[in-house]
């Protein structure tokens, strides 16, 4: 059985579908079309307790996702992702993107 934090930070299929449509089925960085599988990038990383909710997830192709995660321009990519999420999610609040101990899974949305 998975731990609550693991469940809270993974991205459910319905969230991937919402994010992929919201992001026009394209990588938010290079604007190339990508399959729905690529709606899988966390703004607040899973390792930091980033929730698998639309406000924390964006669509990125493999190349851009790697660059955003650990490339020499990762801060630039993160800034673009933050602005994108703020624009697409009117009530975006970075503090609400983290898993908090005792949080129920249905509190994510």
Residue ranges of predicted features:
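Short Cys/His-rich "knuckle" micro-motifs
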Residues: 36-43, 70-74
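Polybasic, low-complexity binding patches
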Residues: 3-7, 47-58, 66-109
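Generic preference for hydrophobic/aromatic residues in regular secondary structure cores
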Residues: 1, 34-36, 81
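Generic detector of short, locally flexible boundary/turn motifs and exposed helical patches
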Residues: 5, 25-26, 43
């Amino acid at each position: 059985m998975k731990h609550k934090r693991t469940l809270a930070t993974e991205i459910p299929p319905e969230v991937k579908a919402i994010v992929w449509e919201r992001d026009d089925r394209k990588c938010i960085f290079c604007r190339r079309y990508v399959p729905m599988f690529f709606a899988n990038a966390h703004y607040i990383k899973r390792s930091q307790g980033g929730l698998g909710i639309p406000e924390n997830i964006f669509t990125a192709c493999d190349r851009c996702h790697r660059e955003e995660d650990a490339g020499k321009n990762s801060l630039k990519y993160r800034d673009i992702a933050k602005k994108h999420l703020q624009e697409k999610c009117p009530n975006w609040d970075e503090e609400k993107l983290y898993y908090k101990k005792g949080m129920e899974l249905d509190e994510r949305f």
